[in-house]
Amino acid sequence: MDMEDRDAAIANALEALHMNQTALRAGLEEVSTWIRQRGSVNVHDNVMATLEALDLQASSIASAIERLRS
């Protein structure tokens, strides 16, 4: 496997992980909103703060994919 193929394989794997992370984030946000609507604002706030970390990592993953594919 040459360097270009290796980079493409890594980019593909990262993209799949990124898509899974995005889907998990969306699901967690939905559940968190449901929890907030039932009175647990604290839990919702904690989940949303944690999801911000996922957002930061999502940016890094997207940048890495872009670099590998350029």
Which residues does each PLM region occupy?
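Long amphipathic alpha-helical coiled-coil
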Residues: 4-7, 11-36, 44, 48-51, ...
